[in-house]
Amino acid sequence: MPKVSLFNQTGSQVGEIELADNVFGVEPNESVLHDAVVMQQASLRQGTHKTKGRSEVRGGGRKPWRQKGTGRARQGSIRSPQWVGGGVVFGPTPRSYSYKLPKKVRRLAIKSALSSKVKDSELVVLDDLKLEAIKTKAMKDVLASLSVDSKALVVTADYNENVALSARNLPGITFLTADGVNVLDLLKHDKLVITKDAVEKVEEVLA
């Protein structure tokens, strides 16, 4: 079982915590991580692209000239695809790009991301995280005491308004609850700052 240091809000080590081997100690699977990230990014796409076909472009209801006798090629509408300003053939239409990987694959991806954080010493576990008021400076001081000066993902067991709103204005800092932990956020942040309660909650879901 991997062991990591347990810190308090002032940055002092107050003990150690054993992490579940089947959640934080698996061999990171890069292929599964890639699949999970692509799935999440696909779900974020708006999919609102649209072009007009020949039946949707304004005008073109009248035949531009008679069929025979003009010497020109026959035409039925000025909105045919070959005309400038005509409709688009097989153009993009609004669609949803979202899809879901199997649950086992999604879980393995999260386990791989969490394990890579442990492996790369990018995991910081707190005994607790509480702020008396909504103050950005207070949150900044907590992170500074933990030597977190880059992009970090802050995770607590349940929603904490003071922590969430205090972290909101800090560049590169994202707040999540334990049940919202996902591969994309884990990988795009350099550090994972997580409370002991949140670790237990994540292990309970993924173990």
Swiss-Prot record:
One of its GO terms (molecular function) is rRNA binding. Disulfide bonds: none annotated. Transmembrane segments: none annotated. Residues 44-77 are annotated as: Disordered. Keywords: Ribonucleoprotein, Ribosomal protein, RNA-binding, rRNA-binding. GO terms for cellular component: ribonucleoprotein complex; ribosome. The keyword Nucleus does not apply. GO terms for biological process: translation. Coiled coil: none annotated. It comes from the Bacteria. Residues 60-71 have a biased composition (Basic residues). One of the primary rRNA binding proteins, this protein initially binds near the 5'-end of the 23S rRNA. It is important during the early stages of 50S assembly. It makes multiple contacts with different domains of the 23S rRNA in the assembled 50S subunit and ribosome. Belongs to the universal ribosomal protein uL4 family. Part of the 50S ribosomal subunit. This is Large ribosomal subunit protein uL4. It comes from Shouchella clausii (strain KSM-K16) (Alkalihalobacillus clausii).
